[in-house]
A protein has these predicted regions:
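Conserved S-adenosyl-L-methionine
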Residues: 30-92
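SAM-dependent nucleic-acid methyltransferase catalytic core
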Residues: 2-23, 29, 74-192, 196-203
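Glycine-rich S-adenosyl-L-methionine
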Residues: 206-213
Length: 213
């Protein structure tokens, strides 16, 4: 299975991309539009687009950290790849990137987007709020750079950027996104609703649902 997403994501759905391809075929949606209001790592959306199943993807995430990542790799591709190449993969850098997340509301998008990426690749299970692989003392069986294959990750990002004109990106609440899109979508469109885990969401994601939602 080809991996297109540069992110590791709790609850990632890359393994069921083939199911969605079959769903497009069964419902005569080939060449249509795929919409994901909670994009996260975007594995399914990227697979459908890059393999020519969908002609357009509309991706959205209310979490500004994730929006910043997607915005940055689409609009600052070269700068982002330079950051991957030039940023030391160290505990000191990990602390610096974590500080950026603490001020995510005001952070510049490229800086925030790279911070999201760096922490995703260096934290256990890709959880932004989680602990670093190998621990702060780097005494674990796997160390901070265990999931940080720079060359492969840059290739994925550059491939995604080639499809920029077919990717529509939003930073909205999912309900607001649906209201904004519903009157303008072509008939051959498919929504995929995969909201954050409910019970464990608080520990896994920056944005999540609670009882009031």
């Amino acid at each position: 299975m080809m991996r297109y997403s540069p992110l590791r994501y709790p609850g990632g759905k890359g393994k069921i991309s083939s199911f969605f391809s079959e769903l497009f075929v069964a419902n005569n949606l080939i060449g249509g539009t795929y919409i994901e209001p909670y994009v996260g790592g975007g594995s399914i959306a990227l697979s459908l687009l890059i393999n020519g199943v969908a002609n357009q993807i509309i991706i959205n995430d209310k979490d500004r950290s994730l929006f910043a990542f997607w915005y940055s790799i689409l609009n600052y591709t070269d700068e982002f790849c330079q950051l991957i190449e030039n940023t030391p993969i160290t505990i000191d850098t990990w602390y610096e990137q974590r500080e950026i997340q603490k001020n995510k509301t005001n952070a510049e998008l490229l800086s925030l987007g790279f911070s999201t990426f760096f922490l995703n690749r260096t934290n256990r299970s890709g959880i932004i709020k989680g602990g670093v692989i190998g621990g702060l003392n780097q005494t674990g069986n796997y160390l901070i750079d265990a999931r940080y294959n720079s060359d492969d990750l840059k290739k994925r990002i550059k491939l995604i950027a080639l499809y920029k004109d077919k990717i529509e990106l939003h930073n909205l609440d999912a309900v607001e996104l649906i209201h904004n899109l519903q009157s303008n979508l072509p008939n051959n469109s498919l929504f995929y609703f995969d909201p954050p885990y409910y019970k464990k969401g608080k520990g896994l994601y920056m944005n999540y649902y609670d009882d009031q939602d």
